[in-house]
A protein has these predicted regions:
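Local cysteine-cluster metal-coordination motifs and their immediate loop/turn environment
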Residues: 30-38, 254-257, 295-306
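Conserved alpha-helical substructure of the radical SAM core
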Residues: 1-125, 136-148, 152, 161, ...
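Radical SAM enzyme [4Fe-4S]-AdoMet core and its adjacent flexible, acidic
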Residues: 24, 43-48, 83, 114-277, ...
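A structure-centric signal for secondary-structure junctions around beta-strands
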Residues: 18, 30, 240-241, 295
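Glycine-rich, flexible loop segments associated with nucleotide phosphate handling
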Residues: 96-100, 168-171, 296
Length: 321
């Protein structure tokens, strides 16, 4: 059966909840981290307007969102109107339990950032800081980052958190190789009031390097990012496990493994429910199930289905020793 017919004939599903929403308020990033697709795609920086952001959020027709992240592959602190963007979130019909910003901590408009924190809408601030805890390795993995900018951000953001948003969690997420790397980072981060989390390398299609040191094995069939909520029987959250990824122009994309592995629709002109039930998403899923190896991005990705997600998925989870 043709994919368009599948989308038309299938019963319309009205989603009530989203488990994780990634919304790139900025398309692109000023860094060229070696394990990231931006290292080869070299995207130009583009920012969503405040009004377009409002339209897109208004078209997300659900009741509740577990976690809303204002990033996917872009750097949110490059937005020139961050505090205005943040102010749009409480206007929505739905409530987000967690609102997260993840940043490379290299460039900040401190006045606007402070105004964003004053609103106490953001509940989690995450800094990416890969390497073994030395300036040399950090800068090698995340060019053209500067170590001193990272340290300045860690210190100044902590002060602003304490002053304006005491409930804000301060977290770092770091790719490390061994326990010694973890300890070196802890010695830097914990005294500054940050909670470190660690993970291994993921195999991200079109990155400059495959940092995993393992041969890529691409599974057949569709992946966890297209799973139905019923496939998450043992998930601890009681709501619907739906995943939504949005680029800064409103385009809905499949995942957080690549900036644009496909296109499902656009929230500037469509409701989320229409995109979820639409022909573009159905066609993409059908192609994954029938000819994944022939797909330009998904044919280079090792993400498997829910319950058997694969090594890259599990390397992204919190690890400690």
């Amino acid at each position: 059966m043709h994919s368009t017919q599948l989308a038309v004939n299938a019963p319309f599903v009205q989603p009530r909840q989203i488990y994780c929403l990634h919304f790139d308020i900025v398309h692109g990033c000023q860094l060229r981290c070696v394990g990231c697709p931006n290292s080869t795609l070299l995207p130009k920086i583009k920012r969503i307007s405040v009004e377009d952001f409002r339209v897109c959020l208004g078209n997300i027709d659900v009741e509740k969102i577990h976690t809303m992240r204002l990033f996917n592959f872009g750097e949110p602190l490059l937005h020139k109107h961050l505090s205005e963007i943040i102010s749009v979130i409480p206007e929505q019909r739905w409530k987000a339990s967690i609102v997260e910003i993840s940043t490379n901590a290299q460039r900040v408009d401190w006045a606007d950032f402070e105004n964003a924190l004053k609103q106490e809408v953001v509940t989690r601030l995450v800094v990416s800081c890969d390497g073994n805890g030395t300036a040399e390795e950090y800068e090698r993995l995340r060019p053209p980052s500067k170590w001193e900018h990272l340290i300045e951000f860690l210190d100044r953001a902590r002060v602003l958190r304490d002053r304006w948003s005491p409930g804000l969690q301060l977290i770092t997420k770091t790719v490390v190789e061994n326990a010694a790397d973890m300890q070196r980072w802890r010695d830097i981060l914990v005294p500054r009031g940050w909670t470190p989390e660690f993970r291994g390398w993921m195999a991200l299609p079109e990155s400059a390097q495959n940092m995993t040191n393992r041969r890529l094995e691409v599974p057949t069939g569709s992946c966890v990012f297209l799973a139905d909520p019923k496939e998450y029987d043992h998930h601890p959250w009681g709501g619907e496990i739906r995943l939504l990824y949005v680029d800064a122009d409103g385009t809905v994309v499949p995942c957080c493994i690549h900036p644009r592995a496909g296109v499902f629709g656009n929230l500037k002109t469509q409701k989320y429910s229409a995109i979820l039930n639409g022909a573009q998403r159905a066609a993409f899923k059908l192609q994954m199930e029938s000819d994944r190896s022939g797909m330009s991005i998904c044919g280079q990705c090792d993400m498997g289905p829910a319950g058997n997600e694969g090594p890259s998925f599990h390397s992204s989870m919190f690890v400690d020793t």
